[in-house]
């Protein structure tokens, strides 16, 4: 099965966007999960600035 050149370009673009989203979204996702799943919930200011 042959994939057209346009389809290849589109797939490359989608993978590049996915790579960028994963790269910049991984740490905020982990922080958000830790914040929302912890018990008791920490104050948001403490999460943003630990010295506050």
UniProtKB/Swiss-Prot annotation:
The chain crosses the membrane at residues 20-36. One of its GO terms (cellular component) is mitochondrial outer membrane. Keywords: Membrane, Mitochondrion, Mitochondrion outer membrane, Protein transport, Transmembrane, Transmembrane helix, Transport. It is a single-pass membrane protein. GO terms for biological process: protein import into mitochondrial matrix; protein insertion into mitochondrial inner membrane; protein insertion into mitochondrial outer membrane. GO terms for molecular function: ATP hydrolysis activity; structural molecule activity. It is found in: Mitochondrion outer membrane. Residues 1-19 are cytoplasmic. Residues 37-52 are mitochondrial intermembrane. InterPro entries: Tom7. Pfam families: Tom7. Belongs to the Tom7 family. Forms part of the preprotein translocase complex of the outer mitochondrial membrane (TOM complex) which consists of at least 8 different proteins (tom5, tom6, tom7, tom20, tom22, tom37, tom40 and tom70). This is Mitochondrial import receptor subunit tom7. It comes from Schizosaccharomyces pombe (strain 972 / ATCC 24843) (Fission yeast). The lineage of its organism: Eukaryota, Fungi, Dikarya, Ascomycota, Taphrinomycotina.
């Amino acid at each position: 099965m042959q994939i057209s050149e346009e389809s290849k370009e589109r797939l490359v673009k989608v993978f590049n966007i996915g790579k960028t989203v994963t790269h910049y979204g991984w740490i905020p996702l982990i922080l958000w999960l830790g914040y929302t799943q912890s018990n008791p919930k920490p104050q948001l200011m403490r999460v943003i600035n630990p010295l506050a």
